[in-house]
Amino acid sequence: MSILFYVMFLAYLRGVQGNSMDQRSLPEDSLNSLIIKLIQADILKNKLSKQMVDVKENYQSTLPKAEDSARESAKSEFQPVMVMGPELLWYQRRYNSSRFLLSDSIPLESPPLFLIEVHLANPMVNSRSPRRKRYAEHKSHRGEYSVCDSESLW
């Protein structure tokens, strides 16, 4: 099914390339190599999934039926090898950012609490200004509130 989808998608891309004469079309070698790589990836994925099913069946059939408690502990120890695709790696990189850190442990100290009245009453704070929306050239930053008092151009 997925091979058929790949072939139809590549035929569609080839047709779009044929209609646009101003762009260079891909050489035949690169298109053939792309098709071959996609088919090989699909076949490899199917083989790995079939092998995992076979390994699980063989693993469960070799255990004796009388050792139910041992079977439960063995099932928890058996973890199939997962193939990490580029999408999973991208998601992993996305959530392992250096800008924030997620933790399950309880912090040793509570964060410091500042009263806003004390902060505003302090005469040393001169740069306190109301927040206002950014007007940036880039669309992704338009309409966001600035988190600092200084202004910078994007």
UniProtKB/Swiss-Prot annotation:
Q: Where is the signal peptide?
A: 1-18
Q: Give the InterPro entries listed for this entry.
A: Nerve_growth_factor-like, Neurotrophin-3, NTF3_N
Query: Which terms does the record give in the GO molecular function aspect?
Result: growth factor activity; nerve growth factor receptor binding
Q: Where in the cell is it found?
A: Secreted
Q: Which residues form the propeptide?
A: 19-134
For this UniProt record, give its keywords in alphabetical order, as a comma-separated list: Cleavage on pair of basic residues, Growth factor, Secreted, Signal
Question: Carries keyword Signal?
Answer: yes
Q: Name one GO biological process term.
A: cell surface receptor protein tyrosine kinase signaling pathway
GO CC terms of this entry: axon; dendrite; extracellular space; synaptic vesicle
Q: Report the main location listed first in the record.
A: secreted
Instruction: Family membership, please give it.
Output: Belongs to the NGF-beta family.
What task does this protein carry out? Seems to promote the survival of visceral and proprioceptive sensory neurons.
Q: Which PANTHER family match?
A: NERVE GROWTH FACTOR NGF -RELATED (PTHR11589), NEUROTROPHIN-3 (PTHR11589:SF4)
Put simply, this protein is called: Neurotrophin-3
Top-level taxonomy: Eukaryota, Metazoa, Chordata, Craniata, Vertebrata
Gene symbol here is: NTF3
